[in-house]
């Protein structure tokens, strides 16, 4: 699949090749992303879904995993037309793969992450076992294992991308300044 490519000739040496899992509701956005070629593995949550658009745009994932019924769920959320339009613009360029909702379960995700990293807890990475984005982290790992028919062998750590620790530029600004891509 686009997010699980490992062939050298299909990878761009200049950019990461992220597979991202996304969960979105009125409480905010939760996501996790993984580059199987480098082992980079991270998660994040934001209370304002619009802030996540900046993260999503800067990561430029090759594939996004969403819970089944994501389109209907997105329609039912009252997040505003500007957000929905911008999300559709960003997602329009990316392969979207629906996964069963239980793949995004937070407790199962925590177990999956610990098992893949070979640890008993996530405190050494600064991540609480109750972190809401562990659901998407588990979904990314389960999907990668399904496609690869085994565990990714190069995962050593998981990092938390914290909202507020970096300057966030909205997608329109990123586009106009050509920060990540040139036209």
Cite the ranges covered by each PLM segment.
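Charged catalytic and DNA/RNA-contacting regions of genome-maintenance
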Residues: 1-183
